[in-house]
From Swiss-Prot:
The keyword Transport does not apply. It comes from Brucella abortus (strain 2308). Its EC number is 4.1.1.23. Homodimer. GO terms for cellular component: cytosol. Pathway: Pyrimidine metabolism; UMP biosynthesis via de novo pathway; UMP from orotate: step 2/2. Keywords: Decarboxylase, Lyase, Pyrimidine biosynthesis. PANTHER family: OROTIDINE 5'-PHOSPHATE DECARBOXYLASE. It comes from the Bacteria. It is an enzyme of class 4 (lyase). This is Orotidine 5'-phosphate decarboxylase. Catalyzes the decarboxylation of orotidine 5'-monophosphate (OMP) to uridine 5'-monophosphate (UMP).
Length: 238
C-alpha cells in the first residue's frame, strides 16, 4: 500500500530505538514524551523482546517502523508479512528484490501496513558494493531498486537522502522515501557514509527521516529531538 506523506514534522521524524534493552527503550520513549510519535525498532531490540514492545507502543497510539530487512523465499516472506500486518505497526522493511516485494505486497493487501524496500544501506559506498560483487555504483543501484519497488506496488523505499531527489523523480509521488543517515550539522557520521542534514534531506525529497544516535545518544534527548523538529518545520513540505 501507499502511505500519506505527513505535513507535520512530528509525523515525519522516526526515532531509531537502537538500544540494547526494553528498559532503555522505555526510558527513551518516556523522555521524548509527546514530542515524538514514531519509532523504529530493529534487530537489536527485536532480539531483546522488541516485538512485544512494538505492540505496547501501538497500544499507546505511537507509530512503529519495524526494520527487519526481510529477504527469503516468496512463501516465507508472505507468511511473515501477514503476521506483521496483524500487529498494527505502520512500516516494515524488506530488501528490494522484485520477487520478495511482490510476495510481500500481495500478503499485505487490505491492511494498513506500509512496505518499504531497502535499496542500498547508507553505511555502504561504491567500494563496498564492488567488494560485494555489484557492478553498479550506489546511485545506479538505488534507482534501479527504487523503480522495481515502484513496479511491485510497494509503499515506499529506504535510501540515502543523497539519492532522494533522483528517486523522487523516478517513482510515484505518493511513495514514501524514508532516509536514514540523518546527521544534524556538526555531528559525527559514525558508521554512516552517505549522510545529510535534516533540512537538506527534506529539500531533496525525503518524506520521513530516521534519526537514532543524534537523539538517543544526546545528553538531553528531548531537546535534541525538538531541535531537529524545529529544523524540519523551517523547511515545510518538500
Amino acid at each position: 500500500m501507499t502511505t500519506e506523506l505527513h505535513d507535520d514534522a512530528s509525523g515525519r521524524l522516526i526515532v531509531g530505538l537502537d538500544v540494547p534493552t526494553i528498559a532503555e527503550a522505555e526510558k527513551v520513549v518516556e523522555e521524548l514524551g509527546n514530542a515524538v510519535s514514531f519509532y523504529k525498532i530493529g534487530y537489536q531490540l527485536v532480539f531483546a523482546g522488541g516485538l512485544d514492545f512494538a505492540k505496547s507502543l501501538v497500544a499507546a497510539r505511537k507509530k512503529v517502523f519495524l526494520d527487519m530487512k526481510l529477504l527469503d523465499i516468496d512463501n516465507t516472506i508472505a507468511k511473515g508479512v501477514e503476521n506483521v500486518a496483524k500487529m498494527g505497526v505502520s512500516m516494515l522493511t524488506l530488501h528490494a528484490y522484485p520477487k520478495a516485494m511482490r510476495a510481500a505486497v500481495e500478503a499485505a493487501r487490505g491492511s494498513d501496513l506500509c512496505l518499504l524496500g531497502v535499496t542500498v544501506l547508507t553505511s555502504m559506498d561504491n567500494a563496498d558494493l564492488r567488494e560485494a560483487g555489484y557492478f553498479d555504483n550506489a546511485e545506479t543501484l538505488v534507482l534501479k531498486r527504487a523503480r522495481q519497488a515502484h513496479e511491485a506496488g510497494m509503499g515506499g523505499i529506504v535510501a540515502s537522502a543523497v539519492e532522494a531527489q533522483a528517486i523522487r523523480q523516478a517513482v510515484r509521488p505518493d511513495m514514501a522515501i524514508v532516509t536514514p543517515g540523518i546527521r544534524p550539522a556538526g555531528s559525527e557520521k559514525g558508521d554512516q557514509k552517505r549522510v545529510m542534514t535534516p533540512a537538506d534531506a527534506l529539500r531533496a525529497g525525503a518524506s520521513h527521516l530516521i534519526v537514532a544516535r543524534p537523539i538517543v545518544g544526546a545528553p538531553d534527548r528531548k531537546a535534541a529531538a525538538l531541535a531537529i523538529l524545529k529544523e524540519m518545520r523551517s523547511i515545510g513540505r518538500s
